[in-house]
Amino acid sequence: MRKMSILHAAGALARAMLLVTWLPLAAAQAAEIRIGFANGSSADYAPAFAAEKLGSFKQAGLDVRLIAFRGGAAAQEALTAGAADIIAYFGPAVALAVSKGVKEKMVATILAGHSGWNLIVPTDSPARSLKDLAGKKIGISTKASTSDMAALWIGEQAGISMTQIPLGAGALIPSLRSHQVDAIVFSALLTMREMLAGRARSLMDVGATMPATMANVYVASEDMLVNRAGELRAALAVIYKTLAYMKANRAWSMSYLKDFAKSDSDELTAALYDGIFPKLSPDGHIETAWIAEGLTLAARAWEVPELAKVKADTLYTNEFHPAAP
């Protein structure tokens, strides 16, 4: 009887120890990390979504939910409202949010420059150079956007004035095809697809010429920065580890990217992979100069001169990206 009691006691102790061991892990896994994106098809975001497909977040003990919003502004609104913990956004817009009292910081670079961006015109357009667009209509997604900034920069470089027409991302290509605008400036997927299909040609490879303005960056809420630093660091580590995997495994990445980016040809998929992936930050490191350049340009493009006075080094931290000690 005494032996049986000892066995029961030992079993109870073992179960108790197992429970004590399991509880902290369960608590750590219970908190969901919500990561928001401007869309669910940009090649810039593919590593995060690939990590989800590969089960890498779960393997790291993280409960991550990826959310594709309708535009970066919607993602920012979600973070402001506490409906997202991390978002992918662009530097000047982060500064604008912070200037309005939102508590957030940039934590890891996705793409500092504008790789894949092009200024395109219809194939039958008489425009052969930027000078030919003087006084013409250029389609952009929205005001206070990256395309808005790019259009201003292009005009300044060419010494011309163009009329910017905010169309929404979904209307850019239809408006160009119907000649409602003379040109558009936008990111890789839309512009490359039109060029490869022979419906448009590029007057400027924006990605190769425009200076880095912190075009795409992970941004974390104050709660993540202060109260969930370990989870933030772990989530970013998974994303950048997946990026390294995708860079080292072209065949798998091409197959995944074709479906993710809704690419309609192997040629377009290859253009996205070869044109963008080598430029994606391998470790998330942030440079103050990238942010400062974006603030200066946005202050003019958006007619918000206060942005030029914001101290770039107050908007980010390199404490959490995978290369940080």
Model-predicted segments: where are they?
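Short, glycine-/small- and polar/acidic-enriched structural segments
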Residues: 31-167, 171-175, 182-189, 199-204, ...
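Predominant activation on well-ordered alpha-helical scaffold segments within soluble catalytic domains
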Residues: 49, 95, 152, 192, ...
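N-terminal secretory signal peptides that target proteins for export/translocation
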Residues: 1-12
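Conserved C-terminal helix/tail region of periplasmic/extracytoplasmic solute-binding proteins
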Residues: 295-325
